[in-house]
Structures are given as C-alpha cells and as structure tokens.
C-alpha cells in the first residue's frame, strides 16, 4: 500500500464523507505553498546564476550565502504601499493582477509529479493546461487598459499580440505530441514514453519524445519563453522603450503578483516541456528507476529553468517586428510541416509509437 493509500484510508475512517473534500484542500494547499517557495528560490537562483555568468558573486548578504534574500524581498514588497493612479479604473486595476496569477496556479491541477501523484488526473489534461494558461493574457490587457497610461497600454497590446502569436505554434507542438501519444491525459503521455526499442535496453532517455520530435521540442520551448515575456522576448516590459510596460503604474504586492505569475509560468512551461518531451517522472536509464519519479521531474524542470536564465544572460532583446516574424513566418510553417511529417510517419510501417 502506498503512502497516499494509507492517508486516504486513515482519513476516511476519521472524517467519513467529508474526507475527500478535506484531502483535496490539503493537497491544493501543499502544492501552492511548494510553488511559492520554488518561485522565491528560483528568483535567487536566477540572480546567482546571472551573477556567475557576469563573473560576480550575486546576492550574498542576507543570511548564509544569501539564502534569506527571497524572504527579505517578499517582506519589502509586503510593506510597500499599493499606490493607485488617480486616472486609473479602480476595480479593473485591482482585478488585473489576480487575473494574471490565478491561471498560473490553476494549471498545476493537471501536471503529474509522479505516477499517481496529480491533483486532477483528467482525460483532457493537455487541453485544460493549454486553455487555462491562455487566460493570463486578459489580466495583462486589463492592467494596461485600466492604468490609463500610454506606456502601459502599449505594453499590453504588445503582450496580447505576442502571446496570441506564439500560442499557435505551442498548440501545434502539443497536437503533434497528442498524435504520437494518442491521449490528452498527461500521465498517459508520460507512460507512452516509457516503452520503445531503446527503453527495452535501459536507455529510456532515447525513447522520450525529444528525439523524434526535436523540432517541436525546440519550437515549444522557445515559444514558451516568448509566452512568458522573458528575455530575449521581453519587449512587453522593455525598460529602454516603455519603462515597465503594463506594470508601470503598479507597486507593492499588486506589482509582486505580476512577477509571481511570470515565474510560476516559467515553472509551468518547464514542467510541461519535461512531461511532454523529456519523459516526465521517468528515469533516463533503467538502472536508476529506484529513484523516486518526482526527483527526476524536479531535475528536468531545474535544467530547463536554467536554460531560461541562460537565455536572459546571453541574448540581446529582439525588436518587436523580429519577434512577430519569428512566430508567424518561421515557427508556424515549421510546425505545419512537421505535423504532416509525423502524420505520415505514424501511418507508415516505420511507426515507432506503436
């Protein structure tokens, strides 16, 4: 009997019919707290890694080796006043940050941490993740519009165009994964990557989707960077052009919610990429299968997040027209071509996903 089965049986005996509701709330709370801690220390890791790339130390004053720096940053933002511009639309101005951060949390309902460990193991998990993650753009648009500032509105318009453009290529990448796995269930997609010619020899990592679907993996990950408005696609909040984009008139915790959503979305994109293309909780080699699946998922997500940060420290910011051209004239045609190629591949005698 697994740990979850033991907890379920004990809780049912203790609380009866109320236990499923209590257990669901406990799991949601645990996942939310862990995500918040991950965001706090992802920001510290970003500052440290970029510091090392710049040949400097990074934050090292608050706590041992700077480990308490995220807590100091949170306290600073909590103590700052939320100053609302006189010309802003009050309620829309206050609702916008919530509309950005809630979808970022909601996506975690369907992401499997290991076999059987998922908040909601629904059959349409992939569709749910794509739909929910698309809602955040409305909060960005409302933030730019409610501030009644030309800089904020320009940033919001850029965000809307950029997110819609790259959602198309991300959607094509997810369709290709759906074609190969034959299911929208994220746990089922991970399970479909655990068998194959290479997996039978213990080389599990060669059976994952990243190898046969490499162009889709690259397109999905780069589109994910653009979706989260991260460097080098951060023209939405381009400091040298429009100050801070849609967040220019926000302060205190309202401002912090936008940053919280950005970093949660980074983790979401990395977790989905690991699940869809890198085998999720699967071990890279058969002899390492004794290691808990969540350890492998965390390791893969950490690696992909480090690539996010490396891109920020390495590449210059694209011009807005270059970003649009990349999405519409390069990524979408590549996705359509590879979609057709994979379709013929699946129908041919050389199908490796049987």
UniProtKB/Swiss-Prot annotation:
Keywords: Cell inner membrane, Cell membrane, Membrane, NAD, Quinone, Translocase, Transmembrane, Transmembrane helix, Ubiquinone. It is an enzyme of class 7 (translocase). PROSITE patterns: COMPLEX1_ND1_2. It catalyses: a quinone + NADH + 5 H(+)(in) = a quinol + NAD(+) + 4 H(+)(out). The chain crosses the membrane at residues 25-45, 91-111, 126-146, 170-190, 205-225, 267-287, 290-310, 330-350. GO terms for molecular function: NADH dehydrogenase activity; oxidoreductase activity, acting on NAD(P)H, quinone or similar compound as acceptor; quinone binding. GO terms for cellular component: plasma membrane. GO terms for biological process: aerobic respiration. Belongs to the complex I subunit 1 family. This is NADH-quinone oxidoreductase subunit H.
């Amino acid at each position: 009997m697994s740990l979850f089965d033991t907890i379920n049986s004990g809780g049912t005996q203790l609380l009866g019919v109320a236990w499923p509701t209590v257990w669901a709330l406990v799991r949601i709370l645990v996942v939310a707290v862990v995500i918040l801690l991950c965001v706090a220390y992802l920001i510290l890791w970003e500052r440290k890694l970029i510091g090392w790339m710049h040949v400097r130390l990074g934050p090292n004053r608050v706590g041992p080796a700077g480990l308490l720096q995220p807590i100091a940053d949170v306290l600073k933002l909590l103590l700052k006043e939320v100053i609302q511009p006189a010309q802003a639309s009050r309620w829309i101005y206050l609702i916008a940050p919530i509309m950005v951060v809630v979808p970022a949390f909601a996506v975690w309902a369907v992401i499997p941490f290991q076999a059987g460990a998922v908040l909601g193991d629904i059959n349409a998990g992939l569709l749910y993740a794509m739909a929910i993650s698309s809602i955040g753009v409305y909060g960005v648009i409302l933030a730019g519009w409610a501030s009644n500032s030309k800089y904020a509105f320009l940033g919001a318009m850029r965000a809307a165009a950029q997110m819609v453009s790259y959602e198309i290529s991300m959607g094509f990448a997810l369709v290709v994964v759906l074609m190969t796995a034959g299911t929208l269930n994220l746990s089922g997609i991970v399970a479909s990557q655990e068998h194959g010619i290479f997996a039978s020899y213990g080389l599990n990592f060669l059976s994952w989707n990243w190898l046969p679907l490499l162009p889709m993996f690259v397109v999905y990950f780069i589109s994910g960077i653009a979706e989260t408005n991260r460097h080098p696609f951060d023209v939405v909040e381009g400091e040298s052009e429009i100050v801070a984009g849609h967040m220019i008139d926000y302060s205190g915790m309202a401002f912090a919610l936008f940053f919280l959503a950005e970093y949660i979305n980074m983790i979401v994109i990395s977790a989905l990429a690991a699940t869809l293309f890198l085998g999720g909780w699967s071990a890279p080699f058969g002899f390492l299968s004794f290691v808990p699946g969540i350890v492998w998922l965390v390791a893969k997500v950490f690696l992909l997040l480090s690539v996010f940060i490396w891109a920020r420290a390495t590449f210059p910011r694209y011009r807005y027209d270059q970003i649009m051209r990349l999405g519409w004239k390069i990524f979408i045609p590549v996705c359509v071509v590879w979609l057709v190629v994979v379709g013929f591949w699946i129908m041919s005698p050389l199908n490796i996903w049987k």
